[in-house]
């Protein structure tokens, strides 16, 4: 397996890569449903006001 390049990373680089991967995992995990809801809201013909969507009171 001498044809595969070997990357020698410092401990600091490994820690940064680990933090970046953890951050992207959290963004994808917690941002998926709001993203899908936004896409559904953005592509409707009768788009309600965004503040009305966040209000717990029914809109008139």
Swiss-Prot record:
<feature type="transmembrane region" description="Helical">
    <location>
        <begin position="20"/>
        <end position="41"/>
    </location>
</feature>
<comment type="subunit">
    <text>Forms part of the preprotein translocase complex of the outer mitochondrial membrane (TOM complex) which consists of at least 7 different proteins (TOM5, TOM6, TOM7, TOM20, TOM22, TOM40 and TOM70).</text>
</comment>
<dbReference type="GO" id="GO:0030150">
    <property type="term" value="P:protein import into mitochondrial matrix"/>
</dbReference>
<keyword id="KW-0653">Protein transport</keyword>
<dbReference type="GO" id="GO:0045040">
    <property type="term" value="P:protein insertion into mitochondrial outer membrane"/>
</dbReference>
<keyword id="KW-0812">Transmembrane</keyword>
<dbReference type="GO" id="GO:0005742">
    <property type="term" value="C:mitochondrial outer membrane translocase complex"/>
</dbReference>
<keyword id="KW-1000">Mitochondrion outer membrane</keyword>
<dbReference type="Pfam" id="PF08038">
    <property type="entry name" value="Tom7"/>
</dbReference>
<keyword id="KW-0472">Membrane</keyword>
<comment type="similarity">
    <text>Belongs to the Tom7 family.</text>
</comment>
<keyword id="KW-1133">Transmembrane helix</keyword>
<comment type="function">
    <text>Component of the TOM (translocase of outer membrane) receptor complex responsible for the recognition and translocation of cytosolically synthesized mitochondrial preproteins. TOM7 is involved in assembly and stability of the TOM complex.</text>
</comment>
<dbReference type="InterPro" id="IPR012621">
    <property type="entry name" value="Tom7"/>
</dbReference>
<protein>
    <recommendedName>
        <fullName>Mitochondrial import receptor subunit TOM7</fullName>
    </recommendedName>
</protein>
<dbReference type="GO" id="GO:0005741">
    <property type="term" value="C:mitochondrial outer membrane"/>
</dbReference>
<feature type="topological domain" description="Cytoplasmic">
    <location>
        <begin position="2"/>
        <end position="19"/>
    </location>
</feature>
<keyword id="KW-0813">Transport</keyword>
<dbReference type="GO" id="GO:0005739">
    <property type="term" value="C:mitochondrion"/>
</dbReference>
<keyword id="KW-0496">Mitochondrion</keyword>
<feature type="topological domain" description="Mitochondrial intermembrane">
    <location>
        <begin position="42"/>
        <end position="60"/>
    </location>
</feature>
